Structures are given as structure tokens and as C-alpha cells.
């Protein structure tokens, strides 16, 4: 039996998402996470899963960034109580705090401090690092003959600006992307009569 390993953000993680309609699915998506965290979770699960498998990967906002918390930096974030979906990064005792594109804490002052820390990196740098990780996922699947389908949740490649990100995008294999990365699943759902739950 073929196992289907899926990753992404809340678009894939939340109950009732597309991933919950697939049999034999192993869903390692994390709500609010960016592509780096999501791809890392998928890569680890692909290595740990034996037998036939395929991978479906939903790309969230490429400028999202998380900070992994372990014993080395735990004291810096000791006022933060992680949500369950932010714990056990790749099955470890580590957790992460989300700075951009995700809820970190109800303490607004602390949330602002984390966002300031994370956003010292430009959106382009965060996107570059995300697409480098997506390139790694593509290469891993190709090397191990694992069929891969990738798609954008709501932002497609047309939203990416900057000289460096344009160079990095040249290394992406767009043949494994739904609509070659020129459309989002959100737009397809709306065009086909699906309603937003909000």
C-alpha cells in the first residue's frame, strides 16, 4: 500500500482540509508554519517512512520564518508557552516560535519583540531560504524516486520580487508543481464554487 506524506501550513493541517480526504495519508503539516519548517517535517517523515510513498507539498507564504527553541536558547524565550501545534519539531523535544505569518502568543508586547527579531531579515531573504529548502525537497524526492506534487495555497510565484529570489527560482523544477506554480489552490477553489469558512 502506498503511503501519502503531505506537508504545509493550516491550509493542509486544519481539520476538514484537502488532506483529510485522502486515504493512507501521513499529515505532518503545521498551522502557521512557513515552507522551511514544513519541508523539514516532510523530509524527516519521508526518511522515516518505509515502503512505497508519494509526497504532496503545499507551499505557504515563503516569507514566514520560525525560530527553533532548544536548550541553547530556551532562556531567551522563557515567557513563551508554545501551542501544541508548535511543539515536537520533527519528533524532538524542540518547539518553535512563529514570528511572521503566525500567532506566537497572546502577550502582544512579547509577540511584537519576536516579530521585530524575525523581521530583521528581509522578506526576500526569507523567501530565498524557503526556496532553497524547497529545492532540497525536490532533489531528495528525485534522488529517491519519490513522486512529488507541489502547489501554492494562496500566493504563487508571481508574488516574488527581487534579484536574488529570481536567481533562486531558476533552480526550481516547475514540472512537479500544479499549474507550474502560476496559480493557487485558493483561486481554483473559489472559481469552482467552494466557499471560505470565514
Predicted regions and their residues:
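Alpha-helical cap/lid subdomain in secreted, periplasmic
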Residues: 43-197
Amino acid at each position: 500500500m502506498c503511503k501519502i506524506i503531505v506537508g504545509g501550513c493550516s491550509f493542509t493541517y486544519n481539520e476538514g482540509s484537502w488532506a483529510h480526504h485522502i486515504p493512507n495519508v501521513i499529515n505532518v503539516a503545521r498551522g502557521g508554519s512557513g515552507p522551511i519548517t514544513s519541508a523539514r517535517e516532510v523530509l524527516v517523515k519521508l526518511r522515516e517512512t518505509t515502503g512505497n510513498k508519494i509526497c504532496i507539498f503545499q507551499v505557504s507564504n515563503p516569507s514566514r520564518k520560525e525560530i527553533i527553541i532548544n536548550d541553547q536558547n530556551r532562556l531567551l524565550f522563557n515567557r513563551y508557552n508554545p501551542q501544541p501545534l508548535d511543539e515536537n519539531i520533527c519528533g524532538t523535544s524542540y518547539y518553535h516560535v512563529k514570528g511572521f505569518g503566525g500567532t506566537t502568543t497572546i502577550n502582544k508586547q512579547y509577540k511584537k519583540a519576536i516579530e521585530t527579531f524575525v523581521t530583521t531579515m528581509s522578506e526576500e531573504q526569507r523567501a530565498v531560504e524557503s526556496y532553497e529548502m524547497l529545492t532540497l525537497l525536490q532533489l531528495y524526492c528525485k534522488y529517491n524516486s519519490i513522486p512529488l506534487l507541489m502547489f501554492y495555497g494562496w500566493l504563487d510565484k508571481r508574488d516574488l520580487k527581487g534579484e536574488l529570489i529570481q536567481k533562486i527560482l531558476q533552480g526550481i523544477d516547475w514540472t512537479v508543481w500544479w499549474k507550474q506554480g502560476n496559480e493557487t489552490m485558493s483561486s481554483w477553489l473559489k472559481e469552482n464554487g467552494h466557499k471560505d469558512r470565514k
